[in-house]
């Protein structure tokens, strides 16, 4: 499986056994000015997350794209 990986947001081949792509997002102290923090990567299973953290998992190549928001 190929997934987008942060910090470079490049498509990379996942290690053997890691066939799930994920997009994890959450707010930090800069959320109001910068938006949510985003973490992209590969996993063997969909990661469990703490309350307040959003996770989306998928299992096809490059199914976790992220387009950075534009500053005005």
From Swiss-Prot:
GO terms for molecular function: acetylcholine receptor inhibitor activity; ion channel regulator activity; toxin activity. Signal peptide: none annotated. Its main location: secreted. Pfam families: Toxin_cobra-type (PF21947). Disulfide bonds join 3-21, 14-42, 27-31, 46-57, 58-63. Expressed by the venom gland. InterPro entries: Snake_3FTx, Snake_toxin-like_sf, Snake_toxin_con_site, Toxin_cobra-type. Keywords: Acetylcholine receptor inhibiting toxin, Disulfide bond, Ion channel impairing toxin, Neurotoxin, Postsynaptic neurotoxin, Secreted, Toxin. It comes from the Eukaryota. This is Long neurotoxin OH-17. It comes from Ophiophagus hannah. The lineage of its organism: Eukaryota, Metazoa, Chordata, Craniata, Vertebrata.
